[in-house]
Design a protein with these regions (language model features):
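N-terminal active-site segment of His-dependent metallophosphoesterases
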Residues: 1-42
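Short acidic, glycine-rich surface-loop motifs adjacent to enzyme active sites
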Residues: 30, 130-149
Length: 172
């Protein structure tokens, strides 16, 4: 159980925020909130609430339920605790987009980096409302790309390490 260590980190974050001249509006966790044990979400949230500001969350592969029926059902624990797996919000003049690019393929721990068509359509609509010149921050768990060699050759052995359909995503 890593909650005692998390408690320590949360206290450090709270101390830093109190001592800072900056105005921290929220924190952003980029996934793997808990290590497969979704029953500790409530305790995790209680600890993190001591930081003095709200957190927004991105779903990670460890936040999904494996051995389930489908990709859609793999997200239920996360959605029941935190809400939708993809959403957007504005803070000041910045538009934040959170996406789920963990695509669980219905077998063991196997997932790929992939953004499904529903999210791509939603993303197109969301971006259509944003005035040109607005700063946009996109957050997702799996990197869109790792390095030049990744861009040159698609490798089945590392499909869980980067976004498989990044060309479609980059066109957005």
């Amino acid at each position: 159980n890593e909650l005692p260590e998390l408690e320590k980190y949360s206290e450090d974050i709270a101390d830093y925020v109190k001592q800072s001249d900056e105005d921290y509006t929220f924190g952003l966790c980029l996934g793997d909130i808990v290590g497969w044990d979704h029953s500790i979400y409530p305790e995790y949230n209680k600890i993190m609430s001591k930081g003095g500001f709200d957190y927004r969350y991105v779903i990670g592969n460890h936040d999904m339920t494996n051995w389930g029926r489908s990709f859609e059902t793999s997200m239920k624990d996360y959605e029941n605790m935190y809400g939708p797996c993809w959403y957007s919000f504005n803070v000041g003049k910045v538009h934040y987009i959170v996406l789920n690019n963990n695509f669980y393929v219905g077998r063991d721990y196997f997932y790929i980096g992939y953004i499904d068509e529903r999210q791509l359509r939603w993303l197109e609509r969301d971006l259509s409302y944003i005035p040109e010149g607005t700063n946009v921050v996109v957050s997702m768990h799996i990197p869109t790309t790792l390095d030049k060699s990744d861009r040159d050759a698609f490798q089945y052995g590392v499909i869980g390490d980067n976004l498989c359909n990044k060309p479609a995503f980059y066109k957005m």
